[in-house]
Design a protein with these regions (language model features):
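Phosphate-binding loop of NTP-binding sites
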Residues: 2-130, 134-145, 202-205
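Adenine nucleotide phosphate-binding catalytic loops in nucleotide-utilizing enzymes
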Residues: 105-112, 116, 144-223
């Protein structure tokens, strides 16, 4: 019914879906800024809280009407449990991490089962955190076109070194074999992982390194 009401806007847009227990919102905003820097017409729906199917489809419809050609959406496990994303064509599905300490409303087993539903939707490209302790579990998830990884142990995006400051973070990474230096106003070690994830997503979408660096620098996290 929602599809008949809102139409099928995703047929004209690339859909980037970002999931994981932490960092979804930060990565979504990083990717949003990167794609804006590259000249794409992009819209973002980012929240750690689950949202309803009606809200998602209205967002997609509004983004399409506004001329977006890429949409970025965070994917809480609770929304996957309610089949909110059922039937949507996913261009990129990315996993930030799986931290059991962050789970409050489901068991680790239930969470993994929810996450599996996203990657079972046959996304064109899958981006995974090679540093995550549960990487071997998620390594079974494959994109129909390509599967990429990131992290200090990553092969596609490899974190070479980083510097942490009270009000920001710098990192040097190899992205598809090209060495780039990134800087963000987000402090903390996790910022390095989130930048790496966003860089992998952007590179998967064909964004050049200059725009990745510019977009990362543009994101201003809330205090």
């Amino acid at each position: 019914m929602l599809k008949s009401y809102y139409g099928n806007p995703t047929k004209d847009m690339k859909l980037v879906a970002i999931t994981g227990t932490t960092g979804k919102v930060a990565v979504a905003h990083y990717v949003h800024e990167i794609l804006k820097a590259s000249g794409e017409q992009v819209a973002v729906l980012a929240s750690d809280q689950p949202f309803k199917m009606g809200m998602l489809h209205k967002f997609l419809s509004d983004a399409w009407k506004a001329g977006a050609n890429v949409v970025i959406v965070t994917v809480p496990a609770g929304s996957l449990r309610e089949n909110v994303f059922y039937g949507l064509p996913i261009t990129v599905a990315a996993m930030t991490n799986f931290t059991t300490a962050s789970l409050s409303d489901m068991t680790p087993e239930e969470y993994l089962e929810c996450e599996k539903t996203l990657f079972d939707m046959k996304p064109e490209m899958v981006v995974l955190n090679h540093d995550d302790v549960n990487y071997e579990t998620f390594a079974a998830f494959k994109g129909t076109k390509k599967t990429l990884d990131y992290g200090q142990t990553g092969s596609f995006v490899k974190v070479l070194n980083s510097k942490l400051y009270p009000r920001g973070t710098e990192a040097t990474m190899s992205v598809g074999g090209e060495i780039i230096s990134e800087a963000t106003f987000m402090p903390g070690e996790m910022a390095v992982s989130y930048m790496a994830c966003a860089s992998a997503i952007a590179a998967a979408l064909g964004v050049v390194s200059e725009h990745i660096v510019d977009g990362i620098a543009e994101y201003m996290p809330e205090e």
